[in-house]
Amino acid sequence: VPTLSTASPPPRLADTASRHPRSDPPHKGDGGRRASDSRITAGIIALAAITLLIGGAFAGLLIEGAHDFSGAWAAFDPYLLRVVRFTLWQAILSTLLSVIPALFVARALSRHPRFFGRAFILQLFAVPLALPAIVAALGILALYGRAGYFAGLFSAIGGRGWPGIYGLSGILVAHVFFNLPLSVRLLLEALQTIPADQWRLASQLGMGARPAFRLIEWPTLRAALPGVAGLVFMLCITSFTIVLTLGGGPAATTLEVGIYQALRFDFDPARAVSLTLLQIALTFIVVLALTRLGANVVGDTNLPVAPRRYLSVNGTEASLNAVLIVLALLFVVGPMAATVVAGLGADLGRLAGEATVRQAMLTSAVLAFLSALLSVMLSLALTMARRALALGRRAGPRTLLEHATDTGAGFVLVVPPIVIGAGWFLLLRHAGDVFAIAPVMVVTVNAVMAMPFALRAVRPAYDAASERHERLCAQLGISGWARLRLVDWPSLRRPLATAFAFAMALSLGDLGVIALFGSDSVQTLPYLLLARMGSYRTEDAAGLALLLGIVCLALVLAADWLGREKVGNV
């Protein structure tokens, strides 16, 4: 535990805390009560902010629906049913195309736990999660589009001009680009939970590859499949940016893109209400199913660096596994390499000199910084309140407030950003210029959307620090800001930095809210990138995509490094 640079209490305070590994609820002493009360109050304020954001969106939908109920009901027409059908169809196809190949790639990586470059491949498979969706879409177009690097090859194979991949094909390729690596990592993590005794016994019995798969690997994969497939399905039905950029027209429209079109192009609030309610219902059903399955809805993984090898692999299987791994690697690396090549081909110097680009970069940086700061503050407040309530409960069932501090941030998974933005758009359009509050909406929505990820980084560290220090802080009456600065900060600085960097990366690359509220006066880098794509300035778009991708990737890598690096004194 790091020593504390203060005259009173003495530096031995942290050492004294380490001699009390178990903490009792701080029921005695005014200091303990003040500490619990202040932490609970902070948690209540955080919950109120989340409730206001989501509740305001629902209020906007309900008010608009009540104002024009007949119009909202009439919006349930064949077009709406066609949009729902396409939303489900593209999500089902994307899930199948992502998860089924991932089974074989994950098994191939599991069967070869040690080979040169394996760790690098797994790191590359984590990169798509760090890329903004619009950057990946540009890379896919640069590779497979009508004027892409592979267009000539595809034209020669097909015997006619390559039409490009706009529409369902482009959506599927982009979804597989994001979700195949994620599925591989999740399934590989499941395979690495197989007990070592089973592998040793299989080796002693001389078990071949097929019996080992049927008796050892498949039961583990079968148990993990529903959660992985459900997570991928949820990501696909809430995919806004990919469908917006690669959909190519009304025939390839999902519910979220329909909401955007109804508000920004058609200005049909009644249809927007109907689409939003359907999107909420669909997302709620999927999240409920994921919760029942115990799926990892955040999608993070924790892969061992040097797993052990148990069974020998014959030459034929090794060759087949190598082909699978190389094909998956090429599929993932291709769009990323195309993004870099196309971006370097743009006039980056001219772009950097444009006032519009500089303003968009500054706006993105400021909004992302504020969003990340707010997300970390809300996450820390909920974490502290949850811990204080748990310590004060002693025994018996958890209270409603404790449940809320534990799972309140998870409700944002049910309500996608475009839905929250649509609700507030409808609520505020009667009060004035909705585009004037674009910065507020971008900061608040992105902050709340990043909270599930921030909580994953902050909560374990705070609980561990509380376990060590709670009793001593109660005895000495250390609470509030003094406790956070002197006692908790040394243990929390890295987790908080991890959460901040990841939340900032998510906000920088987000297009959902700014797509609704953006205007010429408020433009972020993703919004400007979309505008350049819409005006067919593809070289400029490629250059902006490269800049945005580098910044977001650097932030996520920093978050990953901060999360893995151990604090030497803790």
What are these regions (language model features)?
Residues 1-45, 113-118, 210, 290-326, ...:
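Transmembrane alpha-helical segments of polytopic membrane transport and secretion proteins
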Residues 36-68, 78-192, 220-247, 274-291, ...:
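Membrane-water interface segments at the C-terminal ends of transmembrane alpha-helices
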Residues 2, 6-10, 160, 193, ...:
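Soluble N-terminal domains of membrane-associated systems
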Residues 119, 202, 269-272, 403, ...:
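Loop-to-transmembrane helix entry/capping segments in MFS-fold secondary transporters
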Residues 78, 113-116, 192-197, 207-210, ...:
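Juxtamembrane helix-boundary/capping and inter-helix hinge elements in multi-pass membrane proteins
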